[in-house]
Amino acid sequence: MNKTAIALLALLASSASLAATPWQKITQPVPGSAQSIGSFSNGCIVGADTLPIQSEHYQVMRTDQRRYFGHPDLVMFIQRLSSQVSNLGMGTVLIGDMGMPAGGRFNGGHASHQTGLDVDIFLQLPKTRWTSAQLLRPQALDLVSRDGKHVVSTLWKPEIFSLIKLAAQDKDVTRIFVNPAIKQQLCLDAGTDRDWLRKVRPWFQHRAHMHVRLRCPADSLECEDQPLPPPGDGCGAELQSWFAPPKPGTTKPEKKTPSPLPPSCQALLDEHVI
């Protein structure tokens, strides 16, 4: 499937999530041992943790949206990464969307983030902590040129390279989605230490943030992991294909009906949503 068709499918998936979703009616985590259920784009979570809003190492954006819930492994990853960044004097980590209290489908903006194992992190590390007003209405820093072929050299910083590398080297991380131009710059800057690049995957948009995804926890027996990324650093023909013009004759795919929820997620909705 060519990139244009993939883009249209991604847009349709995101558009489908614009419809009202019952998951928003669940305002607190569902009690129980932490269990990520289903797939990243069709699932839910029991026993989610709340990311502490107050931290000396990170700040949480758009707290009014209440998207700061996730599996305990995700909360620990954020705390681990932000502590590393702070210890290196790189700045404050800016945390975007995680998931809703019980996971599930958003009403817009995301097709995934449903099992408590995804988090968006801004690709900027302010040295001065943001004000409450800045956090509620964050200004994203677009690192990619208008033509989408490279990063903006005046905005690309070694600290951003290090932030992505630190996240990719974490044992629990399986994928990090960034814009193809950002992946390309990482490939140029990486030197001989390149194993971590395998986890960094080019994807549409993602011009100002990285989307980090963790592996399914071992004790979440109903969690569906993705296959591992292809071997290698992903800096060759696959990456370059993202910069090729779309093939003529690309047709818009038919709108897909959302897949049925995993039975455990449907049961959760039936119990907790009137």
Curated annotation (Swiss-Prot):
Region (Disordered): 228-264
A Gene Ontology cellular-component term: outer membrane-bounded periplasmic space
Gene Ontology biological process terms, A to Z: peptidoglycan metabolic process; proteolysis
Co-factor requirement: Zn(2+)
Binding residue positions for Zn(2+) 2: D147, H150
Family: Belongs to the peptidase M74 family.
Organism per entry: Escherichia coli (strain 55989 / EAEC)
Protein name according to UniProt: Penicillin-insensitive murein endopeptidase
Record keywords, A-Z: Disulfide bond, Hydrolase, Metal-binding, Metalloprotease, Periplasm, Protease, Signal, Zinc
Gene from which the chain derives: mepA
Disulfide bonding pattern of the chain: C44-C265, C187-C235, C216-C223
Subunit structure: Dimer.
Cofactor, free-text remark: Binds 2 Zn(2+) ions per subunit. Zn(2+) ion 1 is bound in the active site. Zn(2+) ion 2 is bound at the dimer interface by residues from both subunits.
